[in-house]
Amino acid sequence: MRIFSALGLVAMYSMSAQPRYAVDGEPAAGPGTPAVVVLRDRIAGVEAAVAPSEGGELSSFRMKRKGEWIEFLYHARDYSPGPGFKGKGPVLWPAVGAQYPVGTVPAASCGPGTYPVAGKTYPMPCHGFARNLPWKELRRSADAKGARVTVQLRDSSETLPSYPFAFQVDATYELSGGQLTINYTVTAGATNTSEMMFSIGNHIAFKLPFVTGTDPGKMTFETSSTTQLLRNSQGVLSGEEKPRTFKTPERLEDFDARVALPLAGYGSRPYAQLVDPQGVSLRLTQQAGSTVGEPLVRFNLYGGPKAGFLCPEPFFGVQNSLNSGHGLVRLARGKEWNWRLELRVDAH
């Protein structure tokens, strides 16, 4: 976040005829460049772009520093076809990770799977289906308090074969005071005949380094975890855990998370922070409207300097939750549940 004095803010306002906050739509410009909604904070020099047609995801998050833009997301606004990790900030819902019958081994670490509901087996893509479907833009606005856009996903003929529930998921992106807040509201349909169950996450990917010329291995990471959930020799969660904390910042060169580290044991406001030694830091905080019992992964750390990205992967759930029953939010019909992410940058 940029910090300005009151007099400085007044002076900057007086020099500019433009309002501090704005929201603009940029139309699609052909294959690989979908339409996006851009939120702008002109005083803080921060912008965020949302792509409704691409899973309603965060497509870009950037800050102007010393006259140049610093983009924080890996493959920001890049939708060109091709293999490999796509980056950006896709929402993971109604599952995080692969889903497979308890006691079996998934065919791939993040491949398609299955889970049961009322005696019937349903398919479920890895990390759920929300990121693979177009979302509808509901509204956008800007005023003296900030700029915001709300996108929505509802049950449809495309979702019912893999998720037999009526639902509504709203994601409101709001830029205010240099901070981006993403509010997710999940609502169970009034026609459901049983509790709706889900986990949620975001596979947000930050590019390494933030500042051109930095050795990414010298960047540091910290988070308020106390434990790590362990995997067995077949790569699935074993049910065991060990103490693991990043409360003291660690250099990225000192660990490799190409095999994801499921981190748990957090307090009420879990956070993760990345710091570029050239004076740029980013802090990601999450907060849920209500909690569930442990085990509960809050950050699923993935990537590193060799990969060129780091994904803190904020979760509210656990891998294979739809089969194990752990880390599940359960909603009665007509009820709603909220989850919030906050992204704040600081530069000097």
What are these regions (language model features)?
Residues 1-4, 167:
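Positively charged n-region of N-terminal signal peptides that target proteins for export
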Residues 6-7, 323:
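Generic anion/oxyanion-binding catalytic loop in active/binding sites
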Residues 7-17:
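Hydrophobic h-region of N-terminal signal peptides that target proteins for export
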Residues 18-183, 189-348:
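Surface-exposed acidic/polar loop and edge beta-strand patches at domain peripheries
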